[in-house]
Amino acid sequence: MGKTDKVVVGLSGGVDSAVAAMRLLEAGHHVEGLFMKNWEDDDTLTHCAAEEDLAEAQAVADHLGIRLHRANFAARYREQVFEVCLREYRAGRTPNPDILCNQRIKFRAFLDHALSLGASKVATGHYAGVGEQGGRFTLLRGEDPHKDQSYFLYTLGQAQLRHSLFPLSELPKPEVRRQAAAAGLPNHARRDSTGICFIGERDFRAFLSRYIQRSPGPMETPEGQVVGEHQGLAFYTLGQRRGLGLGGLPDHDEGAWYVADKDMARNALIVVQGHAHPRLLSTALVADELSWVAGAPPTLPLRCTVKSRYRQQDQPCALEAGPSPTSVVVRFDTPQRAVTPGQSVVFYQGRVCLGGGIIQTRTPVE
């Protein structure tokens, strides 16, 4: 692209997107910002986070001398991300709303809006990269292994990547902070946001219970012994330790308790003791709702590495054709802990992200 072409940067109010915009300006691009409102203020129990974020984004835009556009995608977010997640939680699965948000809001609604403003590219503060050869694009891991966010971007295809820039792809987070402070960016010391995007740092169970009715049932061992009561299967995820309320049970001194499974038919939560309990391990999984960055699946079977959750180390595996034409089987070289239906499994070869899919079922260790 020419440096006179317009790039619209998604300014969130955070330091990453601010430095992304600054680096593009320094490279000579025509840069404008866009602040997305994806969650309605009246749906929060505390202060108005969106107003605070907007104020930070505007301060950054003013400091950089760029225009800041605003767009309200809250209705689309509720329908295409939040309601989808609620359905998944009610079905006993654990969705990843950040991946849905990237797919349906940031790289669809935001991208379309930016193009309508005359942009040729959009940019975000994600720690990932885009490669290009012969008019074909690849999604690359960010250079900083501790911040790489390609896991959350695996649904991006050729149409999105051709219009996308990730200016932080080669930077570690401490360097981003250093550049922000050196440039005097007004939000250089703002701490990173954490938690699920629409929940933030609020209590997960309390927030979700506003939308999903509590449905108590038994907590059981695999042998059928009832050891407690859960508040509703939607509020728990596989591998979870905190919030079970099972500490200090008599005749159970084998260690901490973990969620191992959900019996939806009986509304029973299956729990086990010990971080490495065999019931927490899986030898394989089936994934569908597949997305391939190249636009078409690779030839199977295929040796690659995968992540079945964010921040997991790459796990070597065999990728095979699945039980249906739209699914794949992942066979791990080493059994993996807490493989969770509803979460995403993402496929890699070296630095290149091939794509990924949604975990449907897992094969427990025999």
Swiss-Prot record:
Disulfide bridge map: C101-C197
Gene Ontology biological process: tRNA wobble position uridine thiolation
Whether Zinc counts among this entry's keywords is: no
Keyword Transferase in annotation:
yes
What Gene3D superfamilies has UniProt attached to this entry?
A: Adenine nucleotide alpha hydrolases-like domains (2.30.30.280), HUPs (3.40.50.620), Translation factors (2.40.30.10)
Query: Which keywords does UniProt give here?
Result: ATP-binding, Cytoplasm, Disulfide bond, Nucleotide-binding, RNA-binding, Transferase, tRNA processing, tRNA-binding
This entry's Gene Ontology molecular function terms read: ATP binding; tRNA binding; tRNA-uridine 2-sulfurtransferase activity
Q: From the record, what ranges are coiled-coil?
A: none
Segment Interaction with target base in tRNA: which positions? 96-98
Which catalytic residues are annotated?
C101 (nucleophile), C197 (cysteine persulfide intermediate)
> Which residue ranges are recorded for the region named Interaction with tRNA?
147-149, 309-310
Site positions (Interaction with tRNA): H126, Q343
Q: Where does ATP bind?
A: G10, L11, S12, G13, G14, V15, D16, S17, M36, G125
GO CC annotations, alphabetized:
cytoplasm
Name the enzyme group at the top EC level. Answer: transferase
Can you say where in the cell this protein is located?
Answer: Cytoplasm
Q: Which reaction does it catalyse?
A: S-sulfanyl-L-cysteinyl-[protein] + uridine(34) in tRNA + AH2 + ATP = 2-thiouridine(34) in tRNA + L-cysteinyl-[protein] + A + AMP + diphosphate + H(+)
Principal cellular location given in the protein's record:
cytoplasm
Quote the EC number.
2.8.1.13
| Function of the protein | Catalyzes the 2-thiolation of uridine at the wobble position (U34) of tRNA, leading to the formation of s(2)U34.
Family, similarity comment: Belongs to the MnmA/TRMU family.
Protein name in the entry: tRNA-specific 2-thiouridylase MnmA
Gene name in the database record: mnmA
